[in-house]
């Protein structure tokens, strides 16, 4: 089965239904979304409880985002500091600023990280499939195996400030 994308190109549709499972993710719900112009599949990971939403709408711009609930207990800005610290290298990519390297070498159409009052997100987009997969791999390694775990100085360098009287 194929679907015509927004650019008139045909895209194969993944055959997922509510009994399907892939890579430890089980499908909870499949529905058509008028707002997103396609099929939306909601899934959860059996071991970790991670939630995943996949949208099949034939869009040529592929987008991936890792998001975490980060509910602050105070106004220190610790989650914003962590957002920056996470992007200071990882186990597979131990360079000082992989985010900067990606901006120079990737074909990304969007590359960022953002902290909101209740969540922190790490979104990437690319029209090139291999570039998209590379971006997703770098971001996943950054959030699940950040260098900050071995080097706490990363947190200190990202979290300092000067107050002038």
Which residues make up each language-model segment?
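N- or domain-start disorder-to-order transition segments that initiate the globular core
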Residues: 14-59
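Charged/polar interaction segments and conserved charged motifs
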Residues: 29-37, 137-147, 157
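Short, Lys/Arg-enriched N-terminal segments with co-localized hydrophobic residues
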Residues: 3-12
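Short N-terminal helix-initiation segments at or just after the protein's N-terminus
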Residues: 12, 28-29, 62-69, 164-165
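M16/MPP (pitrilysin/insulinase) zinc-metallopeptidase core fold and M16-derived inactive scaffolds
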Residues: 38, 56-135, 141, 153
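Acidic/histidine-enriched alpha-helical segments
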Residues: 145-165
């Amino acid at each position: 089965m194929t679907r015509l994308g927004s650019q008139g190109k045909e895209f194969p549709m993944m055959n997922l239904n509510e009994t399907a499972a892939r890579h430890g993710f089980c499908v909870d719900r499949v529905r058509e979304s008028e707002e997103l112009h396609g099929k939306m599949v909601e899934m959860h990971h059996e071991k970790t409880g991670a939630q995943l939403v996949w949208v099949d709408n034939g869009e040529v711009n592929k987008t991936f985002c890792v998001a975490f609930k980060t509910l602050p207990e105070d106004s220190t800005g610790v989650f914003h500091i962590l957002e920056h610290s996470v992007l200071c290298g990882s186990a597979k990519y131990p360079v000082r600023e992989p985010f900067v390297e990606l901006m120079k070498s990737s074909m990304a159409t969007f590359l960022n990280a953002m902290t909101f009052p209740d969540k922190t997100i790490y979104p990437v987009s690319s029209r090139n499939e291999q570039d998209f997969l590379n971006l997703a791999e770098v971001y996943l390694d950054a959030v699940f195996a950040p260098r900050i775990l071995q080097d706490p100085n990363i947190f200190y360098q990202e979290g300092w400030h000067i107050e002038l009287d």
